[in-house]
Amino acid sequence: MAEISDLDRQIEQLRRCELIKESEVKALCAKAREILVEESNVQRVDSPVTVCGDIHGQFYDLKELFRVGGDVPETNYLFMGDFVDRGFYSVETFLLLLALKVRYPDRITLIRGNHESRQITQVYGFYDECLRKYGSVTVWRYCTEIFDYLSLSAIIDGKIFCVHGGLSPSIQTLDQIRTIDRKQEVPHDGPMCDLLWSDPEDTTGWGVSPRGAGYLFGSDVVAQFNAANDIDMTCRAHQLVMEGYKWHFNETVLTVWSAPNYCYRCGNVAAILELDEHLQKDFIIFEAAPQETRGIPSKKPVADYFL
C-alpha cells in the first residue's frame, strides 16, 4: 500500500506541474517497464474508450483534455503517441501519463509515436528540457528507455486499428506487426518506422513521403488492409488538423489531433474521440487551456522548423 500512496502523491504533484525527484523517476520507469513488457505490439483495448492524438508537451492542454474527457480511471484512454517535444512541459506530460499507466494499467494505453525516439528528442526539445529541469541527462535516459517498450499499435474490440502514423508496404496483416521486435530505437526505415511515420494521401498505392521517413498511402491500400484484417477503420494522429479531427477515404481512416493551438501559435482546435460500447463515435472538440491557468514557461520554445 505504501507504494500506491507514494504513486498517488507523485500523480498529484505532476498534476500540479511539479517535478518528481530523479530517484522517483527511476523507480517509476522500472515499474512501467514491468507493465509495458507484457503488452503486445498490437495491444488489445476494450470499448468504451476515449482515443487521443498528439500532445507534444502541452501539459496545460492535457489537463484541459482530462477536464473535458474525464479523469483516469473513470475514463478509459488510448493515447496514440507524441507525448513529448515542441511544448514547454514534455517532462511533466510524459511522467504524468506514465504514472497514470503504472497506477491504472487497465485504464490507459500508451502507444509509441515518432517523437518517442532518442534521435528525434535530441533535436526537438525533450532532451534539452530534461537537462534544464534535472541538471543531467539521466531522466532523459530513463524515459527514452521506456519509449522502447511502448506498444506500436492497438486494436479496439477487434475492429478499430490505432497507430501513430499509418500503414506500411511491408505489412499486410496485424500478425506481421505482432512479430516485430519493438524494443529498440525507431529505425530509419522498415515496418516499425512506417507505422510511426506514414501519412494518408489522396493517391493510389504508395508514395514517397516528404518527411523523409515512412510512406504516403492511398485509399486502395487502406481498403485492402481493412479487408485482410476484418477491421472497420484505422485511427491515427501524426498530422496537425485545424479542426481537431479529419476523415479520409470515405471514413476508413481518421486523424485525431489533441494539441490545441499547436506550438502555442497554430490557432487550431483539438479533438478526442469517445467510443461507446457499440463503437458509436462522439468527438469532443476543445481549445487551448486559458492563459491564466498556465503559469510561465521556463524558457522560450525550441527554434522553428517545419510543422
From Swiss-Prot:
Query: InterPro entries per the record?
Result: Calcineurin-like_PHP_ApaH, Metallo-depent_PP-like, PPA2-like, Ser/Thr-sp_prot-phosphatase
Q: Quick one: which residues bind Mn(2+) 2?
A: D82, N114, H164, H238
Recorded hits in Pfam families, A to Z, give: Metallophos
GO MF terms listed in the record are: lamin binding; metal ion binding; phosphatase activity; protein serine/threonine phosphatase activity; protein-containing complex binding
UniProt xrefs under SUPFAM superfamilies: Metallo-dependent phosphatases
Catalytic function, reaction form: O-phospho-L-seryl-[protein] + H2O = L-seryl-[protein] + phosphate; O-phospho-L-threonyl-[protein] + H2O = L-threonyl-[protein] + phosphate
Full protein name: Serine/threonine-protein phosphatase 4 catalytic subunit
Q: What is the species listed in this Swiss-Prot or TrEMBL entry?
A: Rattus norvegicus
